[in-house]
Amino acid sequence: MYNFNEAEYRTNLTRQIDTFGQGVELAKEITKDGYSNIFFIAVGGTVAMMMHFEEIAKQLTTIPVYAEQAGEIVLTGHRHLNRDSLIIMGSKSGDTKETVAAAKWIKDNYGCRIASMVISKESPLGRLTDYQLPLVVFKGVEYEYLSVFGLFYGLLHLHNDFPQINAFEEQLKKLPDLLVAAQAKFDAPAAKIAARYYQSPYLMWIGGGELWGEIYLFTMCILEEMQWMKTKSIKSSEFFHGTLELVDENTDVFLVKSVGAARALDDRVERFLNQYGKNVVIIDIKDYMGDIDDAFAPILAPVFSTAVLNGRLSKYFEKNTGHDLNMRRYYRQFDY
């Protein structure tokens, strides 16, 4: 596969999966001390990844779970935020300006406990963090999901909302094989898609349910930030209330189909696109998940989505555009 080190990928995934128990132990400590609700707070791709946990929480637990933009919450506050809230944050570098500012604001105003996905405990965010979530590598959104899984599903398990935690951990052990297989299966399609659409003046990306954060992340962080491509991300549930009017024979449209409860909305969009669109790409994440148990498929779907989209498609866009994924015009280049 193009630009893919399989041995390194397998090693890092295994190391990250092996930290699941550390997250569960943190969940035990936090549950023993008690908490009133959970706030996921970050910016950019990290808060996009966190949207998945908020969505799954609606379906599995009565624990109030919120995903908030760090730059907003310090200005608006939140009436459910209190001294007993558990804050889950993320900044791999540990110095994301808005996230660090939000952590300081939370500590100064509420004194909440903060669990952070951060590489260094000595970073600005790390120093404000009570519980450091294990993260073994800097790059790769799949590792971010895996970093949070132990803590989040440990908390739900201890709240009697996720009794199948041991079976879930066994499913995680399949991921090195299954994620490599998923990328191998999508490699040729990704090359073909990128060659066809890398010069598109406008790309519409549609998805929803447990994958909405993934659609938002891929369009904003990968295509816009890293490739300078003009995109629009739209929820399947909202597509028929505005965006459908932009579809014609010249519109380049991508639909990423989820595997959970919202899949019926994706099916409806697919039927419309097949009738009225000409340049349509359907990526069904279910096709790439192998023998993952149906009970855990919605939880793990974003991990597979990031493997095929970020892991394969972004690499081929980079190859065709000649625009290095690490090249930025503005982001972190100067103060703004």
Describe every region a protein language model picked out.
Residues L81-R83, S147-F152, V247-E249, D293-A301:
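Short, surface-exposed amphipathic charged segments that create phosphate/polyanion-binding patches used
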Residues A27-T31, L75-N82, T243-D248:
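Short amphipathic alpha-helix with an adjacent loop that forms part of the alpha/beta core around
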Residues Y2-N37, K139-G140, S147, G154-I234, ...:
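Active-site phosphate/pyrophosphate-binding segments
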Residues G213-V281:
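Internal helical hairpin/lid segments
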Residues S120-L133, T243-L246, M289-I299:
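Glycine-rich, charge-decorated loop segments at or immediately adjacent to ligand/cofactor-binding or catalytic sites
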Residues Y2-A7, V269-Y336:
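Phosphate-moiety recognition in structured ligand-binding domains
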Residues S36-Q171, V256-I283:
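Glycine-rich phosphate-binding loops that contact phosphosugars or nucleotide phosphates
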